[in-house]
């Protein structure tokens, strides 16, 4: 059993932040998270290492929210049913919620442990967006009321791991996958109990090293959600058996570290991944890959996002050269400097 103290977990979280920010030049040039409005393609939010920004014109001009100047935001998420509501996870202050498009932020941390400070990801229930799961440095948490109260959902995770990513089954919301620094877990009971599903990943004795395998991203196949992709620090993996057995794919990729995965809902066999080696695209469910980095000044990709309205439009956040946009399925990229809008009224 690999039980860690809060101090050790904080050290691991700090190490993760350092590793993820290798190559950063300026704070505002490191894009930590990208959140796209579910119905209005003009609106998007990004978090950098020093601020949160909002654009109302597809990234041409930006409003900076000063309320986060003293906090480092680690992830952003827009409520898919009430998109004026935004959640921000921070490095040192847990969860903040905003009800008005980014203007006013309030802490929503009741029920979170005192040492839960680093939030990695939020995931919404597919039909009840007030139900949210949070991946944190000390495990998985759940709220049924939009963040008013949180409860731990860690039963079955025998080792205390940093939970880096969570994915919820699009058709059966009782089924969850959690990516941790010790591999992958699945829950068939909305997080009430978890089962380790590491067959085919790196050997168990190596996982006992704690940081031997970080699962940074999990994505479901568009057609068959029993097929799941996992982007890790040791490569890209795929399962066709709900995680009971994993296989390594993308052996031709030049870098093992995968920070993000996107699947095209219109062309289900098309995958995108991002990492320190840039953006790579596969037309055949991960069997073959080509680099898609034309126009990128930095290949260190930290965040990827696909427009929910048009799968040809992609956004890439880099560690070093800011935000980019592609309108041709990643064939070319155009920089989007965080240029201030002349009028920042709501």
What are the residue ranges of the model-derived segments?
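Extracellular glycan-interacting surfaces
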Residues: 12-346
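Bacterial N-terminal signal peptides that target proteins for export
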Residues: 2-13
């Amino acid at each position: 059993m690999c039980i860690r103290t809060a101090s050790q977990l904080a050290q691991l979280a700090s190490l993760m932040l350092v590793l993820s920010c290798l190559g950063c030049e300026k704070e505002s040039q490191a894009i930590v998270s990208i959140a796209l409005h579910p119905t209005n393609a003009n609106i998007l939010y990004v978090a950098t290492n020093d601020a949160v920004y909002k654009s109302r014109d597809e990234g041409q001009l930006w409003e900076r929210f000063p309320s986060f100047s003293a906090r480092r935001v680690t992830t952003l998420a827009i409520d898919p049913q009430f998109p004026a509501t935004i959640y921000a996870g921070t490095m040192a202050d847990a969860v903040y919620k905003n009800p008005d498009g980014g203007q006013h932020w309030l802490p929503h941390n009741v029920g979170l442990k005192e040492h839960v400070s680093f939030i990695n990801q939020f995931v919404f229930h597919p039909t009840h967006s007030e139900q949210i799961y949070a991946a944190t440095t000390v495990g998985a948490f759940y709220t049924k009321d939009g963040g008013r109260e949180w409860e731990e959902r860690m039963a079955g995770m025998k080792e205390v791991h940093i939970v880096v990513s969570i994915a919820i089954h699009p058709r059966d919301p009782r089924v969850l996958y959690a990516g941790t620094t010790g591999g992958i877990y699945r829950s068939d009971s909305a997080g009430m109990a978890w089962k380790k599903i590491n067959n085919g990943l790196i050997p168990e004795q190596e996982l006992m090293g704690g940081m031997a395998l970080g699962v940074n991203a999990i994505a479901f196949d568009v057609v068959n959600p029993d097929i799941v992709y996992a982007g890790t620090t040791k490569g890209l993996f795929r399962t066709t058996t709900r995680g009971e057995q994993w296989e390594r794919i993308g052996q031709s990729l030049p870098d093992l570290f995968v920070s993000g995965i996107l699947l095209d809902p219109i062309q289900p066999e098309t995958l995108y991944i991002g990492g320190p080696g840039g953006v790579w695209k596969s037309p055949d469910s991960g069997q073959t890959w080509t680099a898609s980095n034309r126009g990128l000044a930095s290949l260190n990709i930290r965040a990827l996002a696909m427009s929910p309205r048009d799968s040809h439009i992609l956004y890439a956040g880099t560690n070093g050269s800011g935000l980019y946009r592609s309108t041709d399925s990643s064939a070319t990229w155009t920089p989007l400097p965080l240029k201030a809008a002349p009028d920042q009224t709501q």
